[in-house]
UniProtKB/Swiss-Prot annotation:
Organism of provenance: Xenopus laevis (African clawed frog)
Primary subcellular site in the record, as a coarse category: cytoplasm
Lineage: Eukaryota, Metazoa, Chordata, Craniata, Vertebrata
Feature: compositional bias, Basic and acidic residues: 386-396, 406-423
Superkingdom per UniProt: Eukaryota
GO biological-process terms attached to the record: anaphase-promoting complex-dependent catabolic process; cellular response to oxidative stress; DNA damage response; mitotic G1 DNA damage checkpoint signaling; proteasome-mediated ubiquitin-dependent protein catabolic process; protein ubiquitination; SCF-dependent proteasomal ubiquitin-dependent protein catabolic process
UniProt: Zn(2+) binding residues: 201, 209, 225, 231
Domain statement: Zinc-binding is required for the structure of the protein and facilitate folding.
Physiological role: Substrate-recognition component of the SCF(FBXO31) protein ligase complex, which specifically mediates the ubiquitination of proteins amidated at their C-terminus in response to oxidative stress, leading to their degradation by the proteasome. Fbxo31 specifically recognizes and binds C-terminal peptides bearing an amide: C-terminal amidation in response to oxidative stress takes place following protein fragmentation.
Entry keywords, A to Z: Cell cycle, Cytoplasm, DNA damage, Metal-binding, Ubl conjugation pathway, Zinc
UniProt protein name: F-box only protein 31-B
Underlying gene: fbxo31-b
F-box domain: residues covered: 59-105
Length: 523
């Protein structure tokens, strides 16, 4: 009745009161249905020349509306409200069996645009698709990070036609950082005729096979393969390793000459094989976007030396920008903060000739580091003396340096092509200093801005982690780089241009809390 009352714009009718009075009297079911129809009747009155008069040409109740009008009304309501509406009366229940209503709910709420004829062939109704597939598994849509030790990953669960598919995002083959991501299906869910939804594992080369999905708790679910023999190959582990090496890394055994790289690759394969039966996923969010950000936050793929390409999430936190690893390695695992950029510490690059000199770049970066250390010591001394820094004693400006931004950009951080063609002001020439190693020599030769930053380095097993100084280089809206001063190494990052739905954080606090939890997942 509450739903009916909202539709009608009135409160409870007298029929509701009569039902309460007769409750427990053992009324006949047919009589109760008639009373239900009485309850939704609306006396439509209009004022004519100051007196109340009944409008003879207008329906006196919702039940008198043509069925196609009721279908249109019900189609505009959220699918979660329709079961309550079906309890109002018998006619409403009959109207709600119309598949057109559920087809619209599937399209508007989940983007399903399949032809009804495809459903008729399989004997599945739009109501079945909504209730048994989309609504039942709505909680797993969005972005997730698999719990694969230090390696992590990025999973995007989407509605794809009449399927729900979990796509694992793999970086392009090293060192081609500007190429698009590679997508690999790991599971799918669909309806078989009118039965419940079927979960299938997509690992291996023998086709889909039986699997399970369990929602462990809020923002966490797990998958389980029930036929792991589908993952095995006739040539045994050696054939599986060669296939994985070729498909995931774009390599062959003959390509790998460096002994250390051979060990890293073999270690990763052995580790991943332990998770081919059961795997747990934890929800992650796309970083929130603010108008004054240096560039649109989002996901980037970057070069990490012998570890290959890894995925990072770039986000802004006041005057600090952070890059958090979505995929990782045995040294610095997924979930850790790989870069931290101080947006209040811009660095002016010298001319190209001086820029080629590593000692010159090193001096610029270390000068900023020394200044920060002096200010920290001064602040500590003032606090010991009981003075405190105070707002009027700030050591340097707490406002990030201004930067030119395109007028319009995509919600997922992908800028428009017309905006990219606009030449931003104050472009600086850029070249890597001599002696700095780079996996990809095809880096931009001009940049917009540079800032002091720190990068996280560690020994094997994330032992003795420390932040080391470096230089953050903003090339354009889709690319940035980082010079690791201590390692004499350069990482180039390129934006992932994929669009993600169901990925927005409910609040800034929820996003910050997620970042904190990510660091604990792999430590």
């Amino acid at each position: 009745m509450a739903v009916c009352a909202r539709l009608c714009g009135v409160g409870q009718s007298g029929g509701c009161r009569r039902r309460r009075q007769r409750k427990g009297a053992g009324n006949d079911p047919e009589l109760e249905d008639e009373e239900e129809e009485d309850e939704v009747r609306i006396e439509a009155e209009v004022l004519v020349e100051g007196q109340a008069a009944v409008a003879p040409l207008r329906p006196r109740s919702l039940l008198q509306l043509p069925p196609e009008i009721l279908v249109e009304i019900f189609s505009s309501l959220p699918g979660t409200e329709l079961p309550s509406l079906a309890q109002v009366c018998r006619k409403f229940r009959q109207i709600l069996t119309t598949d057109t209503i559920w087809k619209r709910r599937c399209k508007q709420e989940y983007g399903v645009c399949e032809n009804l004829r495809k459903l008729e062939v399989t004997g599945v109704s739009c109501h079945d698709v909504y209730v048994k597939l989309l609504h039942q598994y709505r909680h797993i849509l969005g972005l997730w990070q698999p719990d694969i030790g230090p390696y992590g990953g990025l999973l995007n669960v989407v509605v794809d036609g009449l399927f729900i598919i979990g796509w694992m995002y793999l970086p392009p083959h090293d060192p081609h950082v500007d190429e698009g991501m590679r997508l690999k299906p790991v599971f799918r869910i669909h309806l078989m005729e009118r039965n419940n939804a079927t979960v299938e594992c997509m690992y291996g080369h023998k086709g889909p096979h039986n699997g399970q999905i369990q929602i462990v708790k809020k923002d966490e679910f797990s998958t389980k393969c029930l036929q792991t023999d589908y993952h095995r190959m006739s040539g045994g582990r050696q054939e599986e390793f060669r296939t994985w090496l070729r498909e995931d890394l774009g390599r062959t055994l003959e390509d790998i000459f460096h002994e250390h790289m051979q060990e890293l690759i073999l270690m990763k394969f052995i580790y991943i094989c332990q998770y081919d039966k059961c795997l747990t996923y934890r929800r992650i969010y796309h970083p929130p976007n603010r108008p004054d950000d240096l560039l649109n936050p989002g996901f980037f793929k970057g070069t990490y030396g012998s570890h290959g390409l890894e995925i990072v999430m770039f986000s802004f936190h006041g005057t600090i920008a952070k890059a958090t690893k979505i995929t990782g390695d045995p040294n610095v695992p997924a979930g850790q903060q790989t870069l931290e950029v101080d947006l209040t510490r811009p660095v002016q690059l010298p001319d190209v000739e001086h820029l080629r000199n590593f000692d010159e770049i090193s001096r610029l970066i270390l000068d900023v580091q020394s200044q920060i250390q002096r200010e920290q010591r001064q602040t500590g001394n003032e606090e010991d003396d009981g003075k405190g820094a105070g707002p009027d004693r700030a050591e340097h400006s707490q406002q990030p340096a201004p930067v030119h931004r395109p007028a319009k950009e995509d919600v997922n951080g992908v800028d428009n092509a017309d905006d990219r063609e606009q030449k931003p002001p104050n472009v600086q020439s850029f070249v890597l200093p001599a002696g700095v190693m780079a996996r990809n020599e095809e880096y931009p030769r001009s940049c917009k801005m540079c800032f002091y930053g720190t990068g996280l380095i560690a020994g094997h097993g994330f032992s003795s982690p420390e932040r080391t100084p470096g230089l953050f280089i903003l090339f354009d809206e889709d690319r940035f780089g980082f010079i690791w001063l201590e390692l004499k190494s350069f990482s180039l990052y390129s934006r992932m241009r994929d669009r993600f739905q169901h990925s927005e954080a409910p609040s800034l606090e929820a996003f910050d809390e997620m970042l904190q939890h990510m660091q604990s997942w792999t430590t």
